[in-house]
């Protein structure tokens, strides 16, 4: 698919997104302003999103909420004049840091340690010791390169961005005995 769309003049943005050169997504990628949220790639960084329908997700500031997954529960809340929020969570400092890191990987294909260290007041190698250990097999497979300055996703790795990013998602690393959760970092 990538080869055919590229041959037709489309630019590969990431995962399942393509755009024509000059399109807002292509321009944002070229200028380093591309952003990703739970709906996909976008040019709108850090804007609040309000979900209205069944199972929809809202993102306001450092909080996420989700409406009920079933229509009857959603309708009952609406009929009673209530917001149909089923569950929600607030991001802590670790969530914000990991979201920043994963955003850099998914949108730009690289992470510069010094930039994250400065923005979040951490020592990258110490903070992400376990995560970097999980990344080692992907380095060995040629999907990501690690240097003293940072991480760079290879052209092969771009096809497996979710797997690379998952190394840094603490919610995906929870023991299997705990209930599965959607990633708060992506």
Locations of the language-model features?
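Short, amphipathic alpha-helical interaction segments positioned at domain boundaries
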Residues: 156-186
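A short, conserved structural fragment
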Residues: 139-149
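Short amphipathic alpha-helical interaction segments
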Residues: 124-139
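Minor-groove-contacting beta-hairpin "wing" of winged helix-turn-helix DNA-binding domains
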Residues: 150-154
